[in-house]
Design a protein with these regions (language model features):
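A broadly conserved sequence feature marking short terminus-proximal activation segments
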Residues: 1-10
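Canonical Radical SAM [4Fe-4S] cluster-binding loop centered on the CxxxCxxC motif
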Residues: 13-63
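Short, well-ordered coil/turn segments that N-cap beta-strands
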Residues: 73-77, 106-108, 133-135
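Hydrophobic faces of well-ordered beta-strands that scaffold small-molecule active sites
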Residues: 25-27, 79, 110-112, 137-139
């Protein structure tokens, strides 16, 4: 599931919702993560394979943009890069997809939910690259390191 929202008690593919006014769109780009948090479903392979957010393959930038083209993003409140892995593992995708989103709707709030290791993962300072593309960065403090 590439684009999803929280609906009821679980994750719902955006494409399968008939009404989504005011919902948040989550963008699931990767399963990769440098952390091994004991509470995370990723650490239990059996659970990871059956979880609806586990990606069989990483979506290309073009595939993600195609999913956005199939919906009216003006119906949503916010777009968040978050999923089963660490979004900054796909920095190139975040940048290109955010450029697309801001081109379509410059007022759409965008956010990354991250472990905060983006600079280490990418071996460079990433904040300047995200300027004017990402409005909010939420850093999880749950990792054991």
């Amino acid at each position: 599931m590439i684009l999803y929202t929280l609906h009821g008690n679980g994750y719902q593919d955006i494409a399968q919702l008939s009404s989504c006014q005011g919902a948040t769109v989550y963008v699931n780009l990767t399963n990769r993560c440098p952390c091994a948090c004991t509470f995370c479903l990723r650490t239990t392979k059996k659970m990871a394979e059956t979880n609806s957010l586990w990606l069989q393959k990483q979506p290309t930038i073009e595939e993600v943009i195609a999913e956005f083209e199939s919906i009216d993003i003006s119906l949503y409140d916010e777009i968040i890069f978050c999923g089963f892995g660490e979004p900054t593992e796909r920095l190139d995708a975040i940048i290109e997809i955010s450029k697309y989103i801001k081109k379509i709707n410059s007022n759409m709030p965008t956010r990354i939910n991250t472990n905060g290791l983006g600079d280490l993962i990418n071996k460079k300072e990433i904040a300047p690259l995200l300027k004017d593309l990402i409005d909010t960065v939420s850093i999880s403090l749950n990792a054991p390191t």
